[in-house]
């Protein structure tokens, strides 16, 4: 019996889980279900498993359910026999989780920004706030990238760069962030990234 993941080919959070699963050798134990979600159109089938109606949502082999990409990755990290991708304890754990939260928080901002762009009357004030926070987060990540080991935070950073290319090519995010750009150019060649490429469909 396999685990079942509510999945979309465009969600960076779903992709985080799938890249993590590939990197830990667990992708073959996950069956994906294409699940359409939108802020204005709740998915009632998904709500039956996740009361907030968000993806990724993972149904485990025993029928219980986990949601939030970070929580799901923490769970997957307990299932494989290789090196842990999230430190289990000590200062390294908190540094890893902080870096992961920074990258994930920027993804949250980008999704809100994209939704605002799609409104009939978008707010310029929000646009300016989103751009300021994006530039601030990218600067912080540029400062830290060379010290971030392979793990959950680095995976999330790889996905972040790809999502910026997919949805915000006009930001030219590589400009002024040469270390992030070099990291992403290398990271996106990993088999796990190639196996989970974004499909705009």
Regions found by a protein language model. Give the residues of each.
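Charged phosphate-binding loop/patch that engages nucleotide di/tri-phosphates or the phosphate backbone
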Residues: 179-198
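Generic structural signal for secondary-structure transition and capping sites
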Residues: 81, 108, 146, 192-193
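Short coil/loop linkers at secondary-structure junctions
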Residues: 27, 83, 172-174, 194
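Non-transmembrane alpha-helical segments in soluble domains
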Residues: 73, 77, 97-100, 138, ...
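Residue-level signal for nonpolar/aromatic packing positions in well-ordered secondary structure
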Residues: 58, 155, 187-190
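Short, surface-exposed recognition loops or helix-turn segments adjacent to catalytic cores
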Residues: 88-91, 149-152, 156, 198-201
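GST-like domain detector, emphasizing the conserved glutathione-binding G-site
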Residues: 1-125
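GST-like fold's C-terminal all-alpha helical module
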Residues: 103-185
């Amino acid at each position: 019996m396999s685990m079942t993941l509510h999945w979309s080919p465009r969600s960076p959070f779903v992709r985080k889980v799938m890249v993590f699963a590939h990197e830990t050798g667990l992708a073959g134990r996950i069956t994906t279900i294409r699940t359409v979600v939108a802020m204005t159109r709740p998915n009632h089938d998904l709500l039956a498993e996740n009361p907030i109606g968000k993806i990724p949502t993972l149904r485990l082999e025993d029928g219980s359910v986990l949601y939030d990409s970070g929580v799901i990755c923490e769970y997957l990290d307990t299932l494989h026999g290789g090196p842990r991708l999230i430190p289990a304890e000590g200062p390294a754990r908190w540094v890893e989780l902080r870096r992961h939260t920074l990258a994930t928080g920027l993804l949250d901002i980008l999704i809100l920004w994209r939704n605002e762009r799609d409104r009939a009357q978008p707010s310029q004030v929000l646009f300016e706030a989103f751009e300021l926070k994006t530039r601030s987060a990218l600067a912080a990540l540029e400062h830290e990238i060379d010290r971030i080991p392979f793990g959950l935070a680095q995976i999330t950073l790889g996905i972040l760069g790809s999502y910026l290319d997919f949805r915000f090519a006009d930001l030219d995010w590589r400009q002024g962030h040469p270390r992030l750009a070099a990291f992403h150019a290398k990271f996106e060649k990993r088999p796990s990234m190639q196996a989970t490429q974004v499909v705009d469909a």
